[in-house]
Regions:
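Short alpha-helix plus adjacent loop in nuclease-associated cores
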Residues: 55-76
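General small-molecule cofactor/ligand-binding pocket signal
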Residues: 49
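Glycine-rich phosphate-binding "P-loop"
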Residues: 1-8
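Acidic/histidine-rich catalytic cores and adjacent linkers
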Residues: 11-45, 53-57, 76-223
Length: 223
């Protein structure tokens, strides 16, 4: 266990890796530059596999920036309420939008704003990168997506497209080794629940003992 969220929180881990001569082949990670740099420094032989949830989130963040920019654009002054109310619908996966009223609300937001519609459909398309029959097909699809993003004429989506190009090999590495950060994210969520239920910990040592016992039978996240 390490303290903090930065790459230095893994210093003890990397020391143990070197001490025991562990040979790391693949590392699932988010798109944090600090963590990517730490892996390259301490395990240069390891292949980076960028977690698809975090890749999708980066595109979702770009879509939200588009939404905010058009919301403040005087050209869409009369449609502000439609755009503002559609925020969470724009960020959701389309298959998770169940009600007819929500679907109509999303359709209206996309209908009245072309830049937002382009950004939204690119966000939906990126998920197909991980649904291809093989790595070559995925590469072809990803390159096509990047090309469309860069031609979108929207600075937020262009930036996202360039980011996907920069990280393309780590995104496609999922086809070589299908690992994600899902388990780690699950553990992090349990820790958040534990801290919330306990209203914060003042004793760091006791908190770490609770973390070590988190997966023992009969141990719940709360005290």
């Amino acid at each position: 266990m390490g303290d903090g969220k930065g790459a230095d929180a893994l210093d003890k881990f990397w020391k143990r890796v070197k001490k025991y001569g562990a040979k790391i082949e693949y590392v699932a990670t988010d798109l944090s530059a600090a963590f990517i740099s730490a892996v390259k420094k301490n395990a240069p032989q390891a292949k980076l596999v960028f977690d698809h949830f975090h890749v999708k989130k980066q595109i979702g963040d770009a879509v939200d920036k588009v939404r905010r920019s058009v919301y403040h654009d005087k050209l869409y002054e009369e449609k502000k309420d439609v755009i503002k109310g559609a925020r969470w619908l724009l960020l959701k996966n389309s298959e998770d939008i169940k009600t007819e009223s929500a679907k109509k609300q999303l359709e209206e937001a996309l209908r009245v704003n072309e830049p937002l519609a382009k950004a939204y459909y690119l966000k939906e398309e990126i998920t197909l990168v991980w649904a291809q029959p093989d790595k070559n097909a995925a590469r072809e699809f990803l390159y096509g997506w990047i090309s469309r993003a860069i031609r979108s004429e929207n600075r937020h989506i262009i930036k996202a497209g360039k980011g996907m190009f920069k990280h393309r090999e780590g995104i496609l590495a999922w086809y070589d080794h299908k690992i994600t950060t899902a388990m780690v994210e699950g553990i992090n969520n349990k820790i958040k629940v534990m801290k919330r239920e306990a209203y914060g910990f003042t004793d760091d040592r006791y908190f770490k003992l609770r973390l070590l016992a988190l997966h023992d039978a009969g141990i719940t996240p709360f005290l």
